[in-house]
UniProtKB/Swiss-Prot annotation:
The modification 3-methylthioaspartic acid is found at D89. This is Small ribosomal subunit protein uS12. It holds the Pfam family Ribosom_S12_S23. With S4 and S5 plays an important role in translational accuracy. Interacts with and stabilizes bases of the 16S rRNA that are involved in tRNA selection in the A site and with the mRNA backbone. Located at the interface of the 30S and 50S subunits, it traverses the body of the 30S subunit contacting proteins on the other side and probably holding the rRNA structure together. The combined cluster of proteins S8, S12 and S17 appears to hold together the shoulder and platform of the 30S subunit. Belongs to the universal ribosomal protein uS12 family. GO terms for biological process: translation.
Amino acid sequence: MVTINQLVRHPRSMKVAKSNVPALEGCPQKRGVCTRVYTTTPKKPNSALRKVCRVRLTNGFEVTSYIGGEGHNLQEHSVILIRGGRVKDLPGVRYHTLRGTLDCSGVKDRKKGRSKYGVKKQKV
């Protein structure tokens, strides 16, 4: 049991919450340049070729970012925006690429959930 004198000398310290997305440094998004665009396979029991890219951010961090949606136009030296959000079946992938901003195009022929994939509303 701690005495009051001990608490006066050294107060209780708060636990510091560890960020899930340290490379963003508290920002909602960060800009970066693709250094490598490739596919990788998920953990068991899933099976696919997930599209990911290695990104060098403006703050010097180098992170792996997932490219969502069907098809993309990214290649080396593309400038993209990333947001937080991990991919559960890809170890080490803690960021998502934002579609429809900077050099990353929106998903072609997307009709539903368009805002998540950078697609404008179609004219009737």
